[in-house]
Amino acid sequence: MEIGWMHNRRQRQVLVFFVLLSLSGAGAELGSYSVVEETERGSFVANLGKDLGLGLTEMSTRKARIISQGNKQHLQLKAQTGDLLINEKLDREELCGPTEPCILHFQVLMENPLEIFQAELRVIDINDHSPMFTEKEMILKIPENSPLGTEFPLNHALDLDVGSNNVQNYKISPSSHFRVLIHEFRDGRKYPELVLDKELDREEEPQLRLTLTALDGGSPPRSGTAQVRIEVVDINDNAPEFEQPIYKVQIPENSPLGSLVATVSARDLDGGANGKISYTLFQPSEDISKTLEVNPMTGEVRLRKQVDFEMVTSYEVRIKATDGGGLSGKCTLLLQVVDVNDNPPQVTMSALTSPIPENSPEIVVAVFSVSDPDSGNNGKTISSIQEDLPFLLKPSVKNFYTLVTERALDREARAEYNITLTVTDMGTPRLKTEHNITVQISDVNDNAPTFTQTSYTLFVRENNSPALHIGSVSATDRDSGTNAQVTYSLLPPQDPHLPLASLVSINADNGHLFALRSLDYEALQAFEFRVGATDRGSPALSREALVRVLVLDANDNSPFVLYPLQNGSAPCTELVPRAAEPGYLVTKVVAVDGDSGQNAWLSYQLLKATEPGLFGVWAHNGEVRTARLLSERDAAKQRLVVLVKDNGEPPRSATATLHVLLVDGFSQPFLPLPEAAPGQTQANSLTVYLVVALASVSSLFLFSVLLFVAVRLCRRSRAASVGRCSMPEGPFPGRLVDVSGTGTLSQSYQYEVCLTGGSETSEFKFLKPIIPNFSP
């Protein structure tokens, strides 16, 4: 047993030489079944499930089905029960003609796993045709001097049935001169010959009429009749003789009509009319009569119709030569039809799986069979597909192939393949057949959603309205269908203290993000969280992205003045010596703004002043300085209103009110002390005098010290202040008041100024200077 095949991976061609003998064991043999022709449609033939040893459900789940050559469905299989039934009435004569036995080959194909079982159905002949003679009357011219025992051939009857149902016997009507002798062709057909048993005498009986009856072997037998007319003629001594008893010729199939097949020749030694020969086909079958004709004068045998090797491979033709006297001779013409490569290969698709899942290698895509009615190399085939496809052709049993995937496929790279099966025979010239297959690739959830960005930065201005759409995230999935449907969700924040659920929400369908409440920049400047995108495949795949939300500041806070305090308490009064030079630092307005950026950039300007032009405010730092030299005409009490404004849109502002007291010298400061009640003044007059005297002495001493200090300070920094004092305009409390540097003069000398209580003539007490510690 030898199977010759060649598989070239680069060319993806499969060369398979199918030899009938070598394929006898290629697949599992199921067996042979038989059915009588003309059996009604739906009749039971066999139970394949039992023959294969399979259960009822296995036949159905494995998609068992019948495959017949040429797509003729003579049989049908009930997969639920395993019953093999007749699909249509079978006419044995139409299916097989004279061939006996009449066998129809079929296969049983089952999937998961792929198995093909070979089987055959034998169609049993019934006696449904009667014998028929091609001629209702046969004329024989028999010389009267014919010797006893001479045989005269008669036309045989035709019966489309085969075997015992074909013609089995011939009978002749009772006659004293003749009897019937039956002979048999090599193909089994029987033909009659008339045997002379008693001498003829033309003068007594010039003509005889007999009835020839043909009987078949059926039960009951059928019959057909023909008339035989015998004309007794005068003596003709010599019968025609052919030059060859057998002529063997070959003719290519598909030869044109009228092609010369052969020329037969006979001779007759008689002269005259008895030596004139005519040629005829002797007892031709219907097929031979339609295929060949002989020229009665020349003996040329020509084609009446084209011969087809695939239908009939050879003909056995008997030719009779008859002379003018009625004598005849016969020869046999053996005509061999030579095969020509005139049939392209045929592809029969048995199973096709589409779509097929991606990521699954070695999947059977299709099962098909290849056949070529030609013979020899003309019937050998090569099967192939395109080079650039991830598929392979594998030979299966007999003439079957399976088309399988070479590797795992990727639907995202290519969702459809158009495969062309090319089957070429080995004849000359080569003929080919192409069969197109479209294979769809079904999606498997093998791609996780992908965000368009790995991180998103969103900007939201504070004081937003709730449910404001602040931005969107977007993810795509290369899969298809439900595997590509993306659902968005918020992932738990990494910061457990971040109330993410109350800050933002996300639309699960489109990824839109919404602020759930109004955001406050001063409370939360920024926050971040993770968003997940999950597809709806099984199992579901997901991916996440980082979202940063930056809260943009809005100008929703007005400047707040830290110094001087504007809380409604007694205002602070700044002391300025009248000897101060222009640019003398009086104080510094300190303010802050809860906003940020430009909204927190503050500018200062003098809004109101008792003496316009006497003081100025630096716009960027809030320092209040003298604009010119002080004069005696300037009022001792000055009231300044400073406007503090931010740089927002629209701008917000606040005002600070300053009280400035112009003094001639620090030894005699002017203090707006409260006037004592008249009764108390009289009771403490002595104390008042003592206090005034002590104050005068102290003032002189203090003036000297301050003068010295002022000179030193002016050398160091003209921007430094010489002192600060809280001077309430109302009554002083009867306790010690500690006034420390709370203004902006943090880098200047500061003094602790204490007022002693207990007398109406309270005095200033200058203590040690407080010198701040500066970091190196």
From Swiss-Prot:
SMART domains: CA. It is a single-pass type I membrane protein. The chain crosses the membrane at residues 691-711. Coiled coil: none annotated. Residues 1-28 form the signal peptide. GO terms for biological process: calcium-dependent cell-cell adhesion via plasma membrane cell adhesion molecules; cell adhesion; chemical synaptic transmission; homophilic cell adhesion via plasma membrane adhesion molecules; synapse assembly. Residues 35-133, 138-242, 247-347, 352-451, 456-561, 568-671 form the Cadherin domain. Residues 712-776 are cytoplasmic. Its main location: membrane. InterPro entries: Cadherin-like_dom, Cadherin-like_sf, Cadherin_C, Cadherin_CS, Cadherin_N, Protocadherin/Cadherin-CA. The keyword Coiled coil does not apply. It is found in: Membrane. One of its GO terms (molecular function) is calcium ion binding. The keyword Calcium applies. It holds the Pfam family Cadherin. CDD domains: Cadherin_repeat. Potential calcium-dependent cell-adhesion protein. May be involved in the establishment and maintenance of specific neuronal connections in the brain. This is Protocadherin beta-16. It comes from Homo sapiens (Human). The gene is PCDHB16.
